[in-house]
């Protein structure tokens, strides 16, 4: 008799679970996430994927492509969403791929993302360098010369990223072309060289952003300092943005927010997923902490999945709340 009760109870649980699965809005629908080739973006992308799975969606592994390709893929419906839409940094790419006519973007996923130019603190203090405009002086520029041509060598970013257009625009706007050579290439490889130079006690000049592990290795304020710019100057869709802060400081880039962007037609047919995209929030500090773990060697696919598990376990109530609110939007 006891076995019969256990079996009946297990069967009832199974039936309830199956019925619940059948009621889930994502049943039978496959989702294709997309991100850039920056592996540190996987954590926040997978967090969204996990929440979608709780809504019943089948979620593929994220595709890694250049941002431009990512936006056009989402606009055409070849991909479903990205969790790394930087605003306003990606505004030109977003607009070029169709803007609000093609994309669904509601809510703010991550707040307070900063970016800009930095130099090592030792050189900054030795030569009293606080502003990138000081690099117009050939004597100052030569301090950062790494290849013997007399110009400062600035580490830029990977071709096709939003920062590439801004850096090139500002190099011209601030009249630095004669004294500063910007290198754009594989960001991770260039950064490895920059960190090696820094550890050797040599001057460094580079672009970076937060959240990212670089600022955990070369800490702003302790090891390196942010450089200000002479005035606000941004290209394209960002051209009217004043980057000056309330305290008068100007680091050349506005503080960015990150958003989950999805194909608009898909979002309209999937209100539960659309609601989820609008309400999910991830603290910048949590991304920094996870990125630092990756840089310390915990960067395999299994490691990153483990980091996602850990975050959800530590924020289970919040995570379940997102899923519950998203499910309610379907009704």
UniProtKB/Swiss-Prot annotation:
BP GO terms, sorted: amino acid transport
Compartments, as annotated in UniProt: Periplasm
GO molecular function terms attached to this record: transmembrane transporter activity
Principal place of residence: periplasm
Extent of the signal sequence: 1-21
Gene Ontology, cellular component aspect: ATP-binding cassette (ABC) transporter complex; periplasmic space
Keywords: Amino-acid transport, Disulfide bond, Periplasm, Signal, Transport
The UniProt record lists the keyword Disulfide bond: yes
Cross-referenced Pfam families: OpuAC
Disulfide bridges in this chain: 157-163
Expression induction: Induced in response to increased extracellular osmolarity, this is the third gene of the proU operon (proV-proW-proX). Osmoregulation requires curved DNA downstream of the transcription start site in proV, which is repressed when bound by H-NS. H-NS may act indirectly to influence the local topology of the promoter.
Record keyword Transport present: yes
Binding site for substrate: 86, 90, 161-163
InterPro entries associated with the record: ABC_Gly_betaine_transp_sub-bd (IPR007210)
Description of how the protein assembles with itself and partners: The complex is composed of two ATP-binding proteins (ProV), two transmembrane proteins (ProW) and a solute-binding protein (ProX).
Role description: Part of the ProU ABC transporter complex involved in glycine betaine and proline betaine uptake. Binds glycine betaine and proline betaine with high affinity.
Protein name: Glycine betaine/proline betaine-binding periplasmic protein
Organism per entry: Salmonella typhimurium (strain LT2 / SGSC1412 / ATCC 700720)
Source lineage: Bacteria, Pseudomonadati, Pseudomonadota, Gammaproteobacteria, Enterobacterales
Gene name for this UniProt entry: proX
